[in-house]
């Protein structure tokens, strides 16, 4: 079987980081940033989503993720995994292919941006398989298009840009006459030692609760359109993120716990299910008994991972002994190809 023009007879594996957020989350939804300037602060971490793709000898699509699927290439619309289905259609894939996905941690409902990381990694793998260079900005934009426009997910756009670019960044999104719709990504220029210092203060704990972000984000999306009080709170959220960005530009990390605390209090007002009594209890235990200066739930809310800022890791771990800690470091890089191996000819 001859390969389509440009298609490599290779095995490709991509590695794409998950992310944590510090401020501005929610302002990256189109219902906000197309009307008002948005700022988000996030960092990628050394926990990854992996995607393997390879050309098959036949005309079938083999998928292995938390489920398995086998579909004829002529029946691509029968694929149940919406991200894979829409990505293959977007890329005009017309050949048999195998796609395998795995991750360092369970990713569903954790609040670490795993769905966007998977999508960015899948796009990079397919572009590489077809011998095509694609920029980080293009990867992020394509992932946003597939996830939001094609798969109709009620989400923002910071996760896709974080996964593509990697590092500790300020992301600004907006729309105006001078720039049109714009996305600007800028790092803070931290050296390795400064990154390690920040990482040593940050601690992730799993609440044991997974949730579908769709309902929470749908409510938040509607609130940003119809509820002026929510819009006003989002303005405050962006203002807090901008202040943090200014401090981080001057290497002042003391503002991080202040931002986490302020962000968590505002975040709980954006939709009804973002927090609950159990999450409030975890936060209280961490900040009173565990000595954490501040913290926030990551992602849409309702469960997943708490991010805490604390000086005494041992004290915090003892206070939250009933919850699983996820040790991590900040990752400086975005999605990348980690294996590009030529297969034997058929």
Whereabouts are the PLM-identified features?
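C-terminal nucleotide
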Residues: 1-23, 28-34, 40-42, 48-95, ...
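Short, surface-exposed acidic
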Residues: 96-97, 134-138
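N-terminal pre-triad scaffold of radical SAM enzymes
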Residues: 99-111
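DPxDG-like acidic metal-binding loop motif
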Residues: 111-136, 164
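Short hydrophobic alpha-helical segments that form membrane-spanning helices or hydrophobic packing faces
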Residues: 123, 306-307
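Glycine-rich active-site/cofactor-binding loop and its immediate structural neighborhood
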Residues: 303
């Amino acid at each position: 079987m001859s390969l389509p023009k440009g298609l490599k007879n290779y095995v490709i594996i991509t590695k794409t980081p998950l992310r944590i957020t510090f401020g501005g989350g929610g302002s990256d939804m189109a219902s906000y940033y197309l009307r008002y300037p948005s700022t988000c602060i996030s960092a990628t971490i050394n926990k990854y989503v992996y995607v393997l793709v390879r050309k098959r000898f036949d005309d079938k699509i083999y998928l292995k993720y938390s489920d398995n699927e086998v579909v004829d290439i002529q029946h691509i619309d029968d694929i149940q995994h919406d991200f894979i289905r829409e990505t293959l259609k977007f890329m005009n894939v017309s050949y048999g292919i195998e796609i395998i996905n795995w991750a360092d941690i369970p990713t569903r409902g954790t609040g670490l941006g795993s769905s966007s990381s998977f999508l960015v990694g899948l796009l990079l793998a397919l572009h590489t398989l077809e011998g095509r260079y694609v920029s980080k900005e293009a990867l992020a934009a394509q992932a946003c298009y597939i996830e939001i426009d094609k798969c109709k997910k009620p989400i923002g756009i910071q996760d896709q840009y974080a996964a593509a670019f990697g590092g500790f960044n300020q992301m600004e999104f907006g729309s105006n006459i001078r720039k049109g719709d714009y996305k600007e990504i800028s790092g803070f220029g931290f050296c390795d030692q400064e990154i390690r210092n920040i990482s040593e203060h940050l601690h992730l704990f799993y609440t044991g609760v997974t949730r579908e972000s769709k309902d929470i984000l749908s409510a938040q999306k509607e609130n940003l359109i119809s509820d002026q009080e929510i819009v006003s709170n989002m303005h405050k959220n962006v203002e807090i993120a901008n202040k943090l960005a200014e401090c981080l530009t001057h290497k002042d990390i003391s503002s991080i716990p202040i931002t986490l605390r302020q962000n968590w209090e505002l975040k709980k007002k954006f939709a009804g299910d973002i927090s609950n009594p159990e999450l409030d209890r975890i936060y209280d235990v961490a900040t009173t008994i565990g000595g954490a200066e501040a913290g926030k739930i990551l992602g849409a809310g309702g469960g997943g991972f708490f991010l805490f800022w604390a000086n005494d890791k041992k004290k915090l771990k003892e206070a939250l002994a009933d919850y699983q800690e996820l040790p991590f470091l900040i990752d400086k890089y975005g999605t990348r190809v980690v294996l590009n191996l030529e297969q034997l000819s058929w």
